[in-house]
């Protein structure tokens, strides 16, 4: 009943129309290398994956085609605010006088909000480590999978990492979630990789660290409300905040 209820919640409350509940036997028919002890699975057959950095580059190229200018190696150092409006943005390469400022600065979004006299949220950085496996491991599965226990359904705001068959036929494993005070701490630690594998082996026991070809760590930018902030400035009128996006940012980008 609990699994069925969660499935129906995703289908009708969250609006994920292709959500279906399948038996462990059907899951193993589709993915023979999954854990044979699995009793049920929630399937979304319409889901898929893209190349994240390829799509990001394509977004940037499309923006330039539509008149955007990209300023690389440019840091915002401060802002002038008068009468509820940002009148100047000071950078290490000069000063801009904007009509509108969009605060999409990730882990630095609260710093930008502070410069604009419009800070009403806080960011607490959260590291996440991914491992990429050799293509031979890509033959183990052909979908996107994660394990989610009953405790995770009620206590977390994410799927808790997973296993992804990439567009390049590798497997991507992760990420984990580790709170950090360092906004740019992209170091990768052995315990993070070990934790990710110990969890994802519940889904696919055949996973092995020997197949890792590379790994990397990113830093999410959650708020304490664990939700997106997409709204106009509350005190500064020519400001729009796009903060607290976290991991789903790539997927939600078209809607955002």
Can you annotate each of these PLM segments?
Residues 71, 102, 240-242:
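Hydrophobic/aromatic beta-strand patches that form the interior of the parallel beta-sheet core
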Residues 79-174, 178-189, 195-198, 204-207:
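Flavin-dependent oxidoreductases
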Residues 58, 158, 166-168, 179-256:
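C-terminal catalytic lobe of FAD-dependent flavoproteins
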Residues 42-100:
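Helical element adjacent to the flavin cofactor pocket in flavoenzyme catalytic cores
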Residues 33-38, 80-87, 96, 222-226, ...:
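A short, glycine/Asx- and small/polar-enriched loop/turn
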Residues 18-20, 69, 211, 238:
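Conserved beta-strand segments of alpha/beta enzyme cores
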Residues 1-30, 158-161:
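Dinucleotide-binding Rossmann-like beta1-alpha1 core, especially the glycine-rich loop
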């Amino acid at each position: 009943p609990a699994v069925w209820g969660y499935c129906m919640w995703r289908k009708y409350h969250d609006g994920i129309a292709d959500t279906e509940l399948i038996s462990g036997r059907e899951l193993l028919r589709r993915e023979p290398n999954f854990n044979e002890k699995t009793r049920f699975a929630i399937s979304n057959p319409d889901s898929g994956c893209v190349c994240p950095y390829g799509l990001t580059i394509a977004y940037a190229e499309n923006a330039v085609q539509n008149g955007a200018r990209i300023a690389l190696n440019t840091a915002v150092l401060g802002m002038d605010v008068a009468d509820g409006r940002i009148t100047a943005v000071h950078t290490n390469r000069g000063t801009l006088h904007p009509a509108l400022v969009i605060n999409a600065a990730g882990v630095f979004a609260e710093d930008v909000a502070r410069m604009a006299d419009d800070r009403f949220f806080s960011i607490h950085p959260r590291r996440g480590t991914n491992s990429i496996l050799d293509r031979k491991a890509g033959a183990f599965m052909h979908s996107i999978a994660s394990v989610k226990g009953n405790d995770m359904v009620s206590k977390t705001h994410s799927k808790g990492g997973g296993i992804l068959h990439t567009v390049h036929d590798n497997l991507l494993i992760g990420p984990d979630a580790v709170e950090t005070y360092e906004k740019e701490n992209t170091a990768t630690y052995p315990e993070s990789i070990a934790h990710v594998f110990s969890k994802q082996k519940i889904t696919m026991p055949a996973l092995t660290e020997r197949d890792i070809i590379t790994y990397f760590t990113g830093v999410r930018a959650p708020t304490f409300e664990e939700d997106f902030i997409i709204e106009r400035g509350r005190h500064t009128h020519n400001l729009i905040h796009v903060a607290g996006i976290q991991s789903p940012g790539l997927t939600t980008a078209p809607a955002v």
